[in-house]
Structure formats: C-alpha cells, structure tokens
C-alpha cells in the first residue's frame, strides 16, 4: 500500500484482498480496501472483482488499473510509474514489468515466471521453466523475469478475467 501510494497517490490506491485483517489494517491507516472472494485462482480475477465493486459503489469508471501482487512489497514507486506510463500509448492494453537476468539460479528457479517477448515487446510465452532454452546447455543466456507488477486498461482486464484457463496454464 505504502509504495503504491508513493507512485500513484493515496487516493488512487486500493488494496483488493480476501483477508479481513489486511483490509482492516489498510483502512486503519487511512487507505481503501475492497474485500473480495477467497475463491480466485488468479490475482487478475481478484482485481477485476475489486474494479466491479468500486464502480458499483459509485466510484466512477476505472480506466487504467495497476496491479502490484502482494508478494512484491519492495517494488519501488518509480517502477510502478514506468508501468503506468506505458498506458499513455492508447494502443497498449496491458503492461508487464519485467527485468533481464543472466543469473542461472534466477533463470532455473520455478518461483520466477519467465517471459519471451517479440521485437515489439509483446509477450509471446510465459513459463516457470527456464526460457528461452538453449540446445547447448553450456551456453550462457539471459531471460526476462516477470515481477508481478502490471497495468491494464479496464476493458482488457475484464476481458482477460473472462478467458478460460489455457491448456498451458493447466500444466
């Protein structure tokens, strides 16, 4: 909450959580929280529910939604601002903060989601496995690691929320 507030302002920061204790804490320090269902499989589902709740409560129509997953408490305000600034291009529907690494431990760690992008920086593929992979295991390569910080246009978030889980996600 604190770091996000530094990036986009307290008035533009809302915590979406299924945990009453977290919601109460956020509200005790003057923040806004939306209690959501505990049944969500993806963080984007929780955020989409929160957007719908905010709009139904008279909060107006949300245009851009920045999402910082709860396991990313150390993301700096400047990083979040960079992701949100991507949305100044009307053609951008989703922005995903990634960082490059050549550290083999980070690359093979299944807790790190890796992403392959095309020349226009569109995400092609996400994996917990080491991607891209080299046919020659002795080659040193780099990868892009997803941080858990995203920005969505409202419509893109709600559309993404409606998509069925893909076969790749089920693996």
Predicted regions and their residues:
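Hydrophobic/aromatic residues located in beta-strands of well-ordered beta-sheets
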Residues: 13-15, 65, 95, 123
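Conserved core of the sugar-phosphate nucleotidyltransferase
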Residues: 76-163
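Donor nucleotide-sugar recognition loop
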Residues: 164-171
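Short phosphate-binding loop-to-helix
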Residues: 20-68, 74-82
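Short, high-confidence coil segments that cap the C-terminus of an alpha-helix
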Residues: 10, 59-62, 89-93
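A short, N-terminal amphipathic alpha-helix
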Residues: 1-12, 24-29
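A conserved hydrophobic position in a structured secondary element of the catalytic/binding core
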Residues: 17-18, 70, 75, 152, ...
């Amino acid at each position: 909450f604190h770091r996000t507030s530094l990036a986009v302002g307290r008035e533009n920061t809302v915590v979406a959580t299924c945990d009453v204790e977290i919601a109460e804490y956020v509200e005790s320090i003057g923040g806004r929280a939306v209690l959501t269902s505990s049944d969500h499989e993806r963080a984007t589902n929780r955020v989409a529910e929160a957007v719908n709740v905010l709009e139904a409560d008279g909060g107006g129509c949300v245009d851009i939604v920045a999402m910082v997953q709860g396991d990313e408490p150390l993301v700096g305000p400047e990083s979040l601002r960079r992701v949100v600034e991507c949305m100044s291009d009307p053609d951008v529907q989703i922005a995903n903060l990634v960082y490059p690494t050549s550290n083999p431990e980070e690359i093979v760690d299944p807790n790190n989601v890796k992403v392959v992008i095309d020349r226009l920086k569109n995400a092609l593929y996400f994996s917990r496995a080491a991607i891209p992979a080299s046919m020659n295991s002795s080659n040193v390569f780099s990868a892009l690691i997803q941080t858990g910080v995203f920005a969505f246009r409202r419509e893109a978030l709600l559309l993404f929320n409606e998509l069925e889980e893909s076969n790749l996600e089920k693996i």
